[in-house]
Regions:
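Membrane-water interface regions at transmembrane-helix termini and the short interhelical loops
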Residues: 12, 96-98
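N-terminal juxtamembrane cytosolic/stromal segments of multi-pass membrane proteins
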Residues: 1-23, 185
Length: 185
């Protein structure tokens, strides 16, 4: 085709390594939450005694809110990772900025920190909500357990640990972005 300069076959086509990495990460994270959702639906289909989502919805004032907040934050994380890919794409393609050795290291920390810290935080919140609401007992023992608000306290240090990893990743990403933005095209 004439006039189409965006073909992958074109050796002069522009590429974005960091944009691609973050898009792939967003796709993987989307796959993880899809797997979690399908697992919950499959378990619900096999367990007709309790409507898991209805139970969690009715007990939203208790530990179950951690489940829903974890799910919502996980979805926000996926959108944030994809949005980050757009920022890196803008730097690498539109502004034609190059990453130095240091900014590459910071971008790697950003990628891992955002994905490990963000996913760890949200998955632990989801798990804490299931454990504290008694729904986890349904998966493990086959019967609905008692609600236990105190169990949430045991998750706080681990959630905080993953939040620190997430924060370090995002801060390093911001520094990498500024360094690349200020570099010459």
């Amino acid at each position: 085709m004439t006039g189409n300069n965006n073909s992958d076959d074109n050796s002069n086509s522009l590429k974005t390594k960091w944009g691609n990495r973050f898009i792939i990460a967003a796709i993987i994270q989307g796959g993880i939450i899809t797997g979690m959702a399908l697992g919950t639906v499959a378990f619900q289909l096999l367990t007709t005694d309790v409507d898991i989502i209805q139970f969690l919805s009715l007990s939203f004032e208790g530990p179950a809110k951690w489940f829903f907040i974890g799910i919502i934050l996980y979805l926000i994380l996926i959108v944030a990772i994809a949005t980050t890919a757009v920022f890196y794409n803008h730097l690498e393609i539109n502004l034609k900025r190059k990453f130095s050795k240091v900014s590459n290291i910071l971008a790697w920390i950003h990628l891992f920190g955002m994905n490990i810290g963000g996913a760890g935080t949200t998955i632990l919140m989801i798990f804490a909500g299931l454990a504290g609401s008694g729904v986890l007992s349904l998966f493990v023992e086959g019967k609905l357990g008692n609600q236990d608000v105190a169990i949430l306290t045991s998750f706080i240090p681990y959630i905080a640990f993953f939040i620190v990893i997430l924060s370090i990743g995002v801060i390093c990403g911001g520094i990498a972005y500024i360094m690349a933005y200020r570099s010459k095209a």
